[in-house]
Design a protein with these regions (language model features):
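Nucleotide phosphate-binding/pyrophosphate-handling subdomain across enzymes
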Residues: 1-58
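Surface-exposed, flexible loop/turn segments at secondary-structure boundaries
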Residues: 42-44, 67, 94, 117
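Residue-level signal for alpha-helix termini/capping positions
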Residues: 27, 100-104, 126
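A general structural signal for well-ordered alpha-helical segments in protein cores
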Residues: 19, 72-75, 118
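Active-site-adjacent alpha-helix immediately C-terminal to a catalytic or transition-state-stabilizing loop
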Residues: 119-126
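C-terminal helical cap/extension that packs against the catalytic core
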Residues: 7-8, 50-108
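Active-site-proximal loop/hinge segments that shape catalytic or ion-binding/gating pockets
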Residues: 114
Length: 126
């Protein structure tokens, strides 16, 4: 846990196996609203991961500062095909700031989708 009010958690789960576990864990979270700052790299099966994401969350799609990162707009477009709406942000810092501004004390913010996303978050947002 990175912050307590609102709760902010990050995780490096970045593939289907990781998200099978993470989606179960996120399903147990008690909060008013869940916010997910999410990005992935281009060599992962994003469609299968998107199927596992909690549909009730607010999404902030972003990309890490690495050549392997999928564009935030590509993720946003793919997510729409899976019934997930959200806004796109060019950096993890901008996505996290938007989520944090939108969150209330009883909300939950999750940052993840790739080790690079978490790395950018820890480097630039903490």
């Amino acid at each position: 846990m990175v912050n307590q009010i609102p709760r902010v958690v990050c995780d490096t789960g970045h593939n289907v196996g990781g998200w099978q576990y993470l989606s179960r864990q996120l399903g147990t979270i008690q909060c008013r609203q869940m916010h997910i700052v999410f990005g992935m790299v281009d060599d992962k099966d994003i469609d299968k991961v998107l199927d596992l994401l909690p549909k009730h969350a607010k999404f902030y799609f972003t990309k890490a500062q690495t050549k392997r990162a999928l564009s935030e707009t590509v993720i946003q477009e793919k997510a729409k095909k899976h019934g997930i709406d959200g806004h796109a942000y060019p950096t993890v810092n901008e996505a996290y700031k938007a989520a944090y501004r939108s969150a209330s004390a009883n909300d939950f913010i999750f940052v993840g989708g790739s080790s690079y996303i978490v790395g950018d978050f820890l480097k630039n947002c903490i």
